[in-house]
UniProtKB/Swiss-Prot annotation:
Protein name in UniProt: Uncharacterized protease MJ1657
UniProt xrefs under PANTHER family: 23S RRNA 5-HYDROXYCYTIDINE C2501 SYNTHASE (PTHR30217:SF10), PEPTIDASE U32 FAMILY (PTHR30217)
Pfam families per record: Peptidase_U32
Domain of life: Archaea
UniProt keyword annotation of S-adenosyl-L-methionine present: no
Biological process, per Gene Ontology: biosynthetic process; proteolysis
Molecular function as annotated in GO: peptidase activity
Keyword Protease recorded: yes
Alphabetized UniProt keyword annotations: Hydrolase, Protease
EC code: 3.4.-.-
EC top class named in words: hydrolase
Family affiliation: Belongs to the peptidase U32 family.
Provenance organism: Methanocaldococcus jannaschii (strain ATCC 43067 / DSM 2661 / JAL-1 / JCM 10045 / NBRC 100440)
């Protein structure tokens, strides 16, 4: 299955569904493939990403019906990393239960959540739950915790995308579906990840007038200083999806804060499992890096064979640094 980012407005959904149907006709391998779209719902509770459009329940209901007519699952993302404890107050519990009951009534297929208590509330309301990547599931112990809650799926922390041994161990010991982010290009083991998620969670829910995004700017700065950090980002190239088939069930395309034209480009590349050109154009990372760097996707052919057995002891290895010199060029 492919899980595709959706900016939230009805017109974008139509474009995504049309693109899926078009590719199904062209590519015979996709005729039996399953699809879902996921959309942020930042109202009050918040999400862990920037949000372009905030659909209301009436809008969501229309979109859910449209998606189902085209055999596309519809997932709503309510994955704030922090909601200030309001979900543990009587008023908060009542309000969240009301939200979940509304989502159930309009036919949403699943909700993506990162908080264990919200998972319990959602399941009590009859909703299927996908554990968000913001839950940072990067070990078997964490995966078992969520699997015991009988969730529909777990989205693995992208930091283990190239740790095939960990993914294999999780696959062999959980019964739920596993979902993996394919084009997220955050820093490997980013030390600012949870703080950045917290920032978005509060900014989306409370409309905080932030002066600037420190974490975003620092992310850019670090990768201009050390370009090998881009190579070390745990992205999965379209051509390398085949290495994950059998290990995971769902390939998640990140980027719901991007314009629909960008999303269409990424859909085409990953569904066709091929991209010739600048890989930066597919990666969900600061746009400034795309404009600054050219990452030759063909120069990365075969790199995954090394990454599959890499022990990630970077101080004793220069593979990514040497690959960056070969594949990654400054445009200007």
């Amino acid at each position: 299955m492919f899980s595709i980012s959706h900016p939230g407005d009805f017109e974008s959904l139509k474009i995504i569904v049309n693109e899926i149907n078009k590719l199904r006709k062209i590519n015979k391998k996709l005729k039996k493939e399953s699809f879902e779209v996921y959309v942020g719902f930042p109202e009050f509770v918040g999400t862990g990403r920037a949000t372009l459009y905030k659909p209301n329940f009436e809008d969501l209901a229309k979109q859910v019906n449209y998606a189902k007519k085209h055999n596309v699952r519809f997932e709503v993302v309510i994955n704030a990393s922090c909601i200030g404890g309001m979900h543990l107050t009587p008023k908060g519990i009542s309000y969240i239960n009301w939200i979940f009951s509304q989502l159930k009534n309009i036919g949403v297929d699943s909700v993506a959540l990162s908080d264990p208590y919200l998972v319990d509330l959602a399941k009590n309301n009859g909703l299927e739950v996908n554990v968000s990547c913001i839950a940072l599931v990067d070990s078997l112990d964490k995966a078992l915790f969520w699997d015991e809650k009988e969730v529909y799926a777990i989205t693995l922390d992208s930091s283990i995308n190239r740790h095939f041994d960990i993914i294999q161990e999780i696959r062999e010991n959980v019964s739920c579906k596993l979902k993996i982010l394919v084009n997220e290009a955050c820093l490997y083991k980013c030390p600012m990840r949870i703080q950045h998620f917290n920032f978005f969670s509060h900014a989306n829910a409370q409309n905080i007038p932030a002066l600037d995004d420190y974490y975003y700017n620092k992310c850019i700065n670090l990768r201009i200083k050390k370009k090998e950090l881009i190579i070390k980002s745990p992205f999965i190239r379209p051509e390398d999806l085949k290495y994950y088939k059998g290990l995971v069930d769902i390939f998640k395309i990140s980027g719901r804060s991007h314009p629909i034209g960008w999303i269409k480009r990424v859909i085409n590349a990953y569904l066709n499992e091929r991209w010739d050109g600048n890989l930066m154009e597919l990666l969900d990372c600061p746009r400034e890096l795309e404009h600054f760097y050219y990452l030759d996707n063909r120069a990365l052919d075969g790199a995954i064979e090394y990454w599959k057995s890499c022990n990630k002891l970077c101080s004793k290895c220069n593979f990514c640094k040497e690959l960056a010199e070969k594949a990654l060029k400054v445009k200007y």
